[in-house]
Design a protein with these regions (language model features):
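Internal alpha-solenoid helical repeat scaffolds
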Residues: 141-144, 149
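Short sequence/structural elements of tandem HEAT/ARM alpha-solenoid repeats
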Residues: 105-112, 167-168, 209
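Short, charge-rich binding segments
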Residues: 139-140, 165-168
Length: 387
């Protein structure tokens, strides 16, 4: 990510105007607070001091450190001046952790104020509470940005919050699960959706993808794929580190794994198409470390082949770094559940009725019936030690 990645997108809009719009997002009635002595008025003044133009610039600048680990934002097209303010504020909260402008207590205070505002204004959050589905035909980009804001804040509360804040989001995890269902994140968009991307649909590459190539549609679908992987990893990590109940069944995640970094970081439509291989193998020279596949495997598909529940061998160079990391976490979660099943063979496991244990059952079957090979022996010995 460039150091000045967000500067130049809208040079006619000074940063103090961006800061003011973020403040208005949190306090839409701020003209009424100027002469008050209420708690809301004090909160407004506190947030006003934090969200100065210079601080917003600093926080967005520092967000690049987080982005290098979790590239959810499409930097080439992201414009903080026109993006959802809740998403920009969530990015500022994360950037503030890396900045020396604020202490931990101030960062956590900022996190709470931002989350309150995001929950009040998020349309997809309101739809999820009412168990309704978002309109992905006409509001896909807006819905995705709202979910990005909610998920980034959830992650920050979980890993950077105080003990009380961490418990708060662990208690609210059901609401986040409802949001993912409302946005239909774990399944590809239907083929008749005007925003659907051919390269994010199941099935082999047919060649028609070259004629139907649309960079904007590809970006929006790739955002959803990366967001899905991120949400699943948060849930799996919470299960592993905090012993919480898993919320998602990996077998139901049919969106593809994230595409190669070279495609996601491409600055133009043509560069992205070349990195995907739509312009032939020779044009993929800049995609040095990825899978070089126009389509990625789905997480459920990849794990099914790995644990032997599906026929065939795992394709060579089938995943990139992001995909490998996602599968390793998912496999760790499956292994954890397998230990529970194996440790109590005569006692029903309380998690067996939960859909997330389907993968664990598949691996248990694989361990029991599949001859041990060199690649599988490490797993067999690990499970034997746990019994």
């Amino acid at each position: 990510m460039l150091d000045n990645w967000f500067i130049g997108q809208s040079m006619s809009h000074p940063l103090h105007i961006l800061a003011q719009s973020l403040l208005t997002f949190c306090f839409p009635n701020m003209p009424l607070l100027s002469n008050q002595q209420s708690g809301e008025a004090y909160a407004y003044e506190g947030l006003k001091n934090i969200l100065s133009g210079d601080n917003v610039k600093e926080f967005l600048f520092e967000y690049r450190h987080y982005h290098s680990h979790w590239p959810l934002i499409h930097i080439a097209t992201f414009d903080p001046f026109s993006a959802n303010p809740g998403l920009v504020l969530a990015m500022c909260c994360i950037g503030a952790v890396y900045s020396d402008k604020l202490g931990s207590a101030e960062v956590r205070w900022l996190m709470e104020r931002v989350r309150e505002s995001v929950l009040k204004t998020s349309q997809v959050y309101k739809l999820a509470q009412a168990h309704q589905m978002a309109n992905l035909d006409h509001q896909l980009a807006a819905t995705t940005e709202e979910v990005q804001a909610l998920v980034l804040l959830h992650s920050q509360f979980l890993w950077h919050g105080s003990q009380q804040l961490r418990q708060q989001v662990r208690d609210d995890v059901r609401a986040l699960a409802n949001v993912t269902r409302s946005a239909s994140l774990f399944q590809p968009l239907s083929r008749d959706n005007p925003n659907a991307s051919a390269l994010h649909q199941p099935g082999p590459v047919t060649g028609e993808e070259v004629n139907s190539w649309n960079w904007n549609r590809w970006i929006e679908n790739e955002k959803r794929a990366r967001l899905t992987a991120y949400i699943y990893l948060i849930d799996a990590s919470s299960t592993i580190f905090f012993n919480t109940q898993p919320r998602y069944d990996v077998n139901n995640i049919t969106v593809p794994l994230p595409a190669d970094d070279a495609t996601w970081e491409a600055r133009t439509s043509e560069d992205c198409a070349s990195a995907l291989g739509l312009r032939g193998p020779a044009a993929q020279k800049d995609n040095e470390s990825g899978s070089r596949r126009a389509k990625q495997l789905a997480l459920s598909e990849a794990l099914c082949v790995l644990n032997g529940a599906c026929p065939g061998q795992f394709p060579e160079r089938a995943t990139n770094a992001f995909g490998k990391f996602g599968m390793s976490i998912a496999f760790s979660l499956t292994y954890r559940m397998l230990i529970v099943v194996s440790s109590h063979p005569r006692r029903p496991c309380p998690n067996l009725s939960h859909p997330a244990t389907a993968s664990a059952k598949s691996v248990f079957k694989w361990r029991k019936h599949t001859p041990i090979t060199g690649r599988q022996s490490w797993y067999w010995h690990a499970t034997k030690r746990s019994q």
